[in-house]
């Protein structure tokens, strides 16, 4: 199963630059989860952000402040902030269909990242992009509310 997960990780932009060896090393730490439709995988504001998710099958709604802001599916991922900081979840993610995901706990990712600084750098760039998008979204909401 590790080789299947490793191949899947290489399809995720965040991990696309991994060597085959790195992908196999990281894949060992991912666990497969099956999630029924209707289950919330994360809840906005909760401090339980200890896992990063990669969706293999199914779709989920992304909900921010009670409003559905997007839909994610196979190849998409979420929970990046949990990989670098124990922080509140920024969105609720709810399964719209039955899902199969691969998850990694932040402490396992950190062990891997310590030995692979290029992965840490790419994650930092990705999280910075997410934060900039969130800042722009909040600015639009603020302008609309004025």
PLM region spans:
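Short beta-strand His + acidic residue motifs that chelate non-heme Fe in jelly-roll/DSBH
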Residues: 62, 80-81, 91-95, 111
